[in-house]
């Protein structure tokens, strides 16, 4: 019996394990007008405070909505929560719609992209200033690319099955080590996610105006596309950060990760120093380091722990270890009214469980770069038949198809156990469907989207057509988990919380920032 099979057998000995996964979704979407252009209106008043509403906030810009579900242990419940949030939001948006694609289209100039506003409290002003820094460092266009983040955790019963009873410190150390092992395997094999679910093989030509690219784009009207691409959002054209390429953040242990992250938020940047921090009495960014704050670190997956009020993410990890992981490689699913499907969630259950149960040797920076090269190949030309990927850095290669099929042998073993625990065959059905996509890349989401883009004559037309369809779908949706009263109560509560935050400030903004960044002087 392989190590993987032995670990799976241990976990499957308690079927309840598979019913207790913790899951949450964060979905971003741009508000846009009837004419297809980006909305320039403020965050809808009927949604409450973007600063304190626990379900509905904004990301980079006023027009970039972000929906956040609470942790759920049941997939239908998770999807119901997400659908209810979309329904409520759409009822407060008037004629505006939600852009159904990761890549923005009819934006106009970067000046039309207004930074998200959160009120007059020091914490709120800091959030907006952080975004001002992002704008000046990378431009606003890159920041309004939308994605879906999937938060995932294993229950205590999972760790009990694998490691038996442990005292609190030993369990904390075990979980952190295991989540970092999962993260290493995610870098090794996570290219399957953009292969199956990448949804940005094309972009509107206006998106790369003034930017150099060596990619051999073809065009449909004003749309540029790469015939075999899966996720330009994950490419150098999308949401990546070349300034961070000098950072060497390792994933072999929580200590190594925190050390690398600590260096990143303290390391000065000559390039960003040219912007200045406070010029003529106006702040331009939080500081001139490579990362203003830890959230600026670009990564396809992150180790996470819920932080206490005022606590930095790294301090939370240092205090109590890894609690869950955040998968950040999902494009918005253009064929779902809520940006992600139940099938995708089930695949992620399977894949992340497989990544945790499989062997995961330590990984140096050289090996990490080799695996990243595989990701880049899949992002740019993943639907190319017979695409060869590297196996580590030793020169061995294997086709994407052969490699994916090997992984699916073990994913199916997990699917059988998950279906046995839950009743039914939902996980095996996902394996059946996606395995057919391995040899038929035109069936992948990027393949289907590119076909529709050609059919309708451009990406903008696709976005407008799907956006209209999903607006009607979301409006027609009846509450399944929440209710109108629950949503309105959260709106009112968020407004009150923002008011209290603004009234409780005792420091000037300068003093507040001085206190917050005191750690940089230690």
UniProtKB/Swiss-Prot annotation:
GO molecular function: ATP binding; glutamate-cysteine ligase activity; metal ion binding
Pathway(s) where this gene product acts: Sulfur metabolism; glutathione biosynthesis; glutathione from L-cysteine and L-glutamate: step 1/2
Record-linked InterPro entries: Gln_synth/guanido_kin_cat_dom, Glu_cys_ligase, Glut_cys_ligase
Origin superkingdom: Bacteria
Cellular component, GO annotation: cytosol
Enzyme Commission number(s) of this protein: 6.3.2.2
Disulfide partners: none
NCBIfam families to which the protein is assigned, alphabetical: glu_cys_ligase
Name of protein: Glutamate--cysteine ligase
Source species of the chain: Vibrio parahaemolyticus serotype O3:K6 (strain RIMD 2210633)
Organismal lineage: Bacteria, Pseudomonadati, Pseudomonadota, Gammaproteobacteria, Vibrionales
GN (gene name): gshA
